[in-house]
């Protein structure tokens, strides 16, 4: 943004030498003249209030007055517009009147005294008006805030509030009394007008603050220069505004990559944690391109609106919604930056701490920060849109408790859905098991989640039930679907043959192209820069779903067999492919068993008879 401001300043300085030649083309506005017009309208309004027949016209004059006040407010900061008060002449007149008052203060001529007193007060409030505008112009710049305008306005409103009203004795003549009353009426009307305008400026500081340097450079001069170049004779001002707006839009969009790169470079210098990792620097830069580019696009549209409405301010509703979008974009940018640099910073702190530092605390800190960013952004948007945030928070008390009791189950399911979304326990399309429910997640709503069971039945499960029970998510696996089997061999197998069989099975699995091994880990297969630091907080293999364990051991002397445990993981997690890999492994194991002349055991029993009774056979008997 500063780069754009400097560009506009350079353009202004480049065109400034020609300004003196064409200065006469645009007449400066007399602000004091606008004040007098507002004062006259107030006088008409006060007169019509006393006449019921003219009361219907008051709204028309109020509209005209409000338009003048808005126009005046937008011109207060423009130094090309004259204040219209000769302050030197004003001070000289004050000195003259003060001298006359000092001589007549003990005199009996009350009429002359009050006339001079009212004249002096009128000069004093004119001086206050001049000092106010001069203070605004000398103190407010492109980097000023609303509170600066409010503070200046409060100080001068306090000075205007110190002026008193007067009462006149009844022994004055009718002519003198009428003249004093007329002077007092003019004085009171002017005092009220000045107070009204200053209060408006205090309550609408945005209309005074310069926007995008429009007030700092001469917009009239720039637009006139553009209209001179364009070959249009009619509507040249409107066309000039469009051309200037489109130029700024193209400039901002063209500079987005440069601004993003400068922002990333600045953050690198601040945190000093990315100096040895250029790849992470590039990835973080990519992550902030979208929010920065959208921000610049919105900013350019905001500038274009200011140009279109110049010299008046943009409509309040437009400014309100644009401000809300700014807050959302800022939250988006902060989250993107924190994901890139914040996680790395916190992780770096954890790795430098003692071994007693709990890694769970880091995870909690990260989640709390994300939640706080979301809450702050939400409250900021609500406040920008005009909601009373304090009242909203207070309404969550007794009234919120009554509503919560009435719709307890609905709220329980709603907040359970929020918890499930924040926890990211599952996504649509995942295969999950929760209690007696098993199937594929079809859709997660605010109240219930629909699941398609494997028998093709559609199940509707309340979110509170899912949030309150353990969830087994079979789809959160990247590499590794378990293959576990017991290979039973006969007891007639020799020890050496069993050892060679176990060794060959293990070598076969280690060399199998579809069985996971040590090379199939998360850090060697995932290129996302965020996990480079996250590995010091949690196990990346378990976090992303990588399993590569492989065990082959003689495991058990069973009733009818000597069992060999085979425990490994296929690289694929797809069921059909997993079945193919498992089949291939089983066939290869059969070949190894046959190679070592071993036999698969099967459940059997051997009966041993220790003795039989003697049986004598008669002669001629057949057995």
Curated annotation (Swiss-Prot):
Keyword annotations from UniProtKB, A to Z: Cell membrane, Membrane, Transmembrane, Transmembrane helix
Topology of this chain in the membrane: Multi-pass membrane protein
Subcellular location as annotated: Cell membrane
GO biological process: transmembrane transport
GO-annotated cellular components: plasma membrane
Domain of life: Bacteria
Keyword set includes Transit peptide: no
Transmembrane segments: 242-262, 288-308, 318-338, 361-381, 387-407
SUPFAM superfamilies xrefs: Mechanosensitive channel protein MscS (YggB), C-terminal domain, Mechanosensitive channel protein MscS (YggB), transmembrane region, Sm-like ribonucleoproteins
Family, as annotated: Belongs to the MscS (TC 1.A.23) family.
This protein's name: Uncharacterized MscS family protein HP_0415
